Amino acid sequence: MDLIDKKILGELQRNAKQNTKEIATKVGLTVTPTYERIKKLEQKGVIKSYVTLLDRDLIGKQIIAFCQITLYKHQRSLLDSFKESILTFDEVMECHNVSGNFDFLLKVAVNDMNKFQEFINDKLSVVEGISTIQSSFVMTSFKDTTSYNL
């Protein structure tokens, strides 16, 4: 990946709705080589998908929580079962296997505290293998980005 590819990726991260001509102008290429570079980045998997970022407040996701999950045993079957369960939960925006004092960190988005309690009681707490769940709630966000510095 060269500097031009990084510029193209930067432009797409800023606004994926731009057309190839706009991107080409900004990175100093013509349309055809810009298009070909974008296609190559897609084929290599560097560009995974194009998404629309939503304003969580305007769609009613008022509560963001980070749940720290500890499993009682690190057995392959329990890990696989845990992962399968988490993938079915629409409330879970992110799930990371981490090192440290707990095993997994979940980012959860729900409409209100009642929905969060339902999620914990009816879904998360019944997942086999979980020994502890600790939750922290976002009060204010100072930085929330999806862009990587290239």
Question: Language model features by range: what are they?
Answer:
Residues 1-150:
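A compositional/biophysical signature of low hydrophobicity enriched in polar/charged and small residues
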